[in-house]
């Protein structure tokens, strides 16, 4: 690029420091011991200090200008070689993605991961499953380099792999606007933009030094080519395209992040991840704060991506929809199962059945051989005994088959205090809203004993507010909310339940004080199921993490007597076994249940009636979740599309005679659940005309 061409569009001005050069400063420049005339020497010192300041300023200015220039190719190559030495790359046998090999990790003497081996390649979406505390997030942190394994290898397809990681504790800057927050996803692009501005300012200040100006113009040209290479002009377009897909309106771009709820801030974090176009995508509980519409959008978006993907989620429907294989971590050991979550459940049952049979056969061989040795140990049979001993040695030299670990499913029941009257809740013509938004306008709802209701709707539509109105924590502007007169005893689980725990109490005290007619051992068993080990029972609540407090609040909720359960996102911090425990407890509960949840799998298991919050009204679907899908055309269309996609992924169904025992049990369980849902639907249908 010609010098005159570059100068034409720039506002060039002289600068006062052009031409100045620095001089070395002697180490003995100022000697305090030589001062004889204080006033004269102080003046001298001031002059010297002034000279030092000017020369230092010039030196700093020159350093700043030199820092604007890109490294020479030879230096970049050298850096790349140094970086490459510490990376395990594709030469180790993978062409894309990442592979974990024999990973072991301990914390303070407690082994979390004993033997973890699995890999994810381009086009694969791996679901990591396991109970809370199994080490799933630790594996992601090892992949990103945030943690180092005690032993084993992390093999990456290329040394400078771009890994995007959305952790459970997402970070956003409250002082930025939404657009500025999304811009942080483009780190390289923003660095180029910032450097272009600095180089342009340096050019404007170097008109008296043509050599320097020539170098700066070359750098400016190089940066412009880099900007074109990273498609800098498309940054705004990418953000503008993604924002509405995440649910943001165009006018939201200039709103502060702090003005949005936690759920919307989670969307921003997801958006930044999606904008990075990574080589490997790691997602840790991505659906926790999203409504159903956004979860379905996210599923559709991720399904289209070819990038290797690792997902930690307790959302079984989400895992079903996305995953091509499941990696289970149990007792520190990983096992890989092909297919989605539902296929994993069947495959895991088959594996346990096969492993149990092999272990029993091995034990039978060992026991019979030992018995033979004991019977033939003396006299004329000593030769046969020796042969049997060799057989036993051979059996023991082989790799012994371990008995498969089977976690005991704890069965609990919500304590009930009698039976409520037939009428439980009546919402009559209520109006409610805030200054900038009306949530309900002449809304009506009638709930009777024994109904199990899901409240559905997008984030911000008023689902949680409706629960607060029912509980009397909010008052309607017009209309009234009436609880039934006879023995309606609510037990309320709200999203921020953990925030109201007594921080001075211990874990065990917190649950024991809420419980009635519970044995101490049963309470400890419940706490253990929720991942509170024996050494944590006497720990103060103030010392618990956010997730631990949420699980403790759930345990407290589980032991509180009631006739009405009111649940606001109860599954957010629960692992899959805990969700199954909760589902079973709700199904056996004889009282009334009102639940807000984005977990479709959970909703399908428990409800016999659906209320959808839409445009300030309460739309009533007097049947289970499947009935809601049948009647709601948009929801049904999306569900049919998902079912079709799952059908394509699923293996062909075996003939009944060829099914394993595990598969037969799984299908028997599915039929029983379908039968129970049909009964609930029949019971609910009589209420179809109940509300106006």
From Swiss-Prot:
Annotated region described as Disordered, given as residue ranges: 64-95, 644-692
Gene3D superfamilies hit by this protein: P-loop containing nucleotide triphosphate hydrolases (3.40.50.300)
Domain ABC transporter: from-to ranges: 98-356, 425-640
Keywords for the protein's UniProt record, in alphabetical order: ATP-binding, Nucleotide-binding, Repeat, Transport
Biological-process GO terms, alphabetical: response to nematode
Similarity annotation: Belongs to the ABC transporter superfamily. ABCF family. EF3 (TC 3.A.1.121) subfamily.
Name this protein carries in UniProt: ABC transporter F family member 5
Organism: Arabidopsis thaliana
Lineage, top ranks: Eukaryota, Viridiplantae, Streptophyta, Embryophyta, Tracheophyta
The encoding gene: ABCF5
């Amino acid at each position: 690029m010609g010098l005159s061409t570059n100068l034409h569009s720039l506002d060039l001005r002289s600068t006062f420091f052009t031409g100045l050069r620095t001089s070395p400063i002697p180490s003995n420049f100022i000697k305090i011991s030589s001062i004889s005339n204080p006033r004269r020497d102080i003046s001298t010192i001031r002059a010297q200090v002034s000279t030092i300041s000017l020369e230092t300023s010039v030196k700093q200015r020159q350093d700043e200008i030199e820092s604007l220039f890109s490294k020479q190719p030879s230096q970049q190559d050298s850096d790349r070689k140094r970086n490459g030495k510490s990376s395990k790359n594709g030469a180790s046998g993978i062409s894309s993605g990442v592979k974990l090999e024999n990973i072991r990790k301990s914390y303070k003497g407690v082994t979390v991961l004993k033997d973890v081996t699995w890999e994810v390649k381009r086009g694969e979406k791996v679901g990591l499953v396991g109970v809370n505390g199994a080490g799933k997030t630790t594996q992601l942190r090892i992949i990103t380099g945030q943690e180092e394994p005690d032993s084993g290898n992390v093999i990456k397809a290329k040394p400078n792999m771009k890994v995007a990681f959305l952790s459970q504790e997402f970070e956003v800057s409250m002082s930025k606007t939404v657009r500025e927050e999304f811009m942080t996803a483009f780190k390289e692009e923003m660095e180029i933009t910032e450097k272009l501005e600095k180089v342009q300012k340096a050019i404007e200040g170097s008109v008296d030094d043509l050599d320097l100006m020539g170098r700066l113009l070359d750098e400016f040209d190089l940066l412009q080519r880099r900007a074109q290479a990273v498609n800098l002009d498309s940054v705004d377009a990418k953000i503008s395209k993604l924002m509405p897909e995440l649910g943001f309106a165009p006018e939201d771009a200039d709103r502060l992040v702090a003005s949005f709820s936690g759920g919307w801030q989670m969307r921003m974090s997801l958006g930044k991840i999606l904008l990075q176009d990574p080589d490997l995508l790691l997602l840790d509980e991505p659906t926790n704060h999203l409504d159903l519409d956004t979860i379905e959008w996210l599923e559709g978006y991720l399904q289209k991506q070819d990038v290797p993907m690792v997902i930690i989620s307790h959302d079984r429907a989400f895992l079903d929809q996305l995953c091509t294989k499941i990696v289970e971590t149990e007792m520190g050991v990983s096992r890989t199962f092909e297919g989605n979550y539902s296929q994993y459940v069947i495959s895991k049952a088959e594996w346990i059945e096969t492993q149990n049979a092999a272990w029993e056969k091995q034990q039978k061989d060992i026991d019979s051989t030992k018995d033979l040795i004991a019977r033939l140990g003396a006299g004329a049979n000593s030769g046969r005994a020796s042969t049997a001993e060799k057989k036993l040695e051979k059996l023991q030299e082989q790799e012994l088959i371990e008995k498969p670990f089977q976690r005991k499913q704890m069965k609990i029941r919500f304590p009930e205090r009698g039976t409520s009257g037939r009428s439980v809740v009546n919402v009559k013509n209520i109006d409610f809203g805030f200054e900038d938004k009306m949530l309900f306008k002449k809304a009506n709802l009638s709930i009777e004993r024994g109904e199990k209701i899901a409240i559905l709707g997008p984030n911000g539509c008023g689902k949680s507010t409706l629960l607060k109105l029912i509980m009397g924590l909010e008052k309607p502007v017009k209309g009234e909310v009436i609880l039934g007169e006879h023995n309606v005893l609510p037990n309320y689980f709200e999203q921020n339940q953990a925030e109201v725990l007594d921080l001075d109490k211990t874990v065990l005290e917190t649950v024991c004080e809420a419980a009635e007619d519970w044995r101490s051992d049963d309470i400890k068993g419940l706490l253990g199921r929720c991942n509170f080990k024996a050494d944590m029972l006497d720990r103060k609540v103030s010392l618990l993490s956010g997730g631990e407090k949420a699980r403790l609040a759930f345990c407290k909720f589980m032991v509180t007597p009631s006739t009405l359960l009111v649940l606001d996102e109860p599954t957010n911090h629960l692992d899959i076994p805990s969700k199954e425990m909760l589902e079973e407890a709700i199904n056996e509960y004889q009282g009334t249940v009102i639940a807000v949840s984005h977990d479709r799998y959970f909703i399908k298991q428990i409800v016999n009636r659906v209320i959808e919050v839409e445009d300030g009204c309460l739309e009533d679907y007097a049947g289970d979740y499947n009935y809601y899908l049948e009647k709601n055309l948009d929801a049904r269309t999306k569900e049919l599309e998902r079912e079709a996609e799952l059908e394509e992924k699923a293996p062909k169904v075996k003939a009944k005679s060829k099914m394993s025992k595990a598969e037969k049990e799984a299908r028997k369980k599915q039929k029983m659940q379908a039968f129970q849902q049909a009964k609930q639907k029949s019971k609910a249908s009589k209420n179809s005309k109940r509300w106006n």
